[in-house]
């Protein structure tokens, strides 16, 4: 039955990523992939928040649906990689490096902040 929880969370995460990335892309013009950056950073925060919840705070199936399902489908390593490689291919190595470092370091920072937020809330 766990597969059903992961699948439902995954559907919701995929749709959230698609809609949010498209919405941001239509409002913020430029060459920086802000949609992917935003979903990956906010996903890192959500995962940090979820991981810091006290054991048993949420039912195991809900944690599975939210963590593996929703956040796993919401964030996108493949799009991040594609955008980075495309920047490098376009001769924009410095921009690719800044995007990569911002994504990775920002993700770690936001996961930690999510962890801290959960600790102060619960």
Swiss-Prot record:
Residues the entry annotates as binding Na(+): 72, 75
TM ranges: 1-21, 33-53, 62-82, 102-122
GO cellular component: plasma membrane
Domain of life per record: Bacteria
InterPro entries: FluC
UniProt membrane topology term: Multi-pass membrane protein
Keywords: Cell membrane, Ion channel, Ion transport, Membrane, Metal-binding, Sodium, Transmembrane, Transmembrane helix, Transport
Regulation (activators, inhibitors): Na(+) is not transported, but it plays an essential structural role and its presence is essential for fluoride channel function.
Catalytic activity field: fluoride(in) = fluoride(out)
Keyword Hydrolase: no
GO molecular function: fluoride channel activity; metal ion binding
Keyword Transport assigned: yes
Any single biological process term in GO: cellular detoxification of fluoride
Pfam families cross-referenced by the UniProt entry: CRCB (PF02537)
Function: Fluoride-specific ion channel. Important for reducing fluoride concentration in the cell, thus reducing its toxicity.
PANTHER family cross-referenced by the UniProt entry: FLUORIDE EXPORT PROTEIN 1-RELATED (PTHR28259:SF1)
Family of the protein in this entry: Belongs to the fluoride channel Fluc/FEX (TC 1.A.43) family.
HAMAP family the record matches: FluC
Name of the protein described by the UniProt record: Fluoride-specific ion channel FluC 2
Taxonomy of the source species: Bacteria, Bacillati, Bacillota, Clostridia, Moorellales
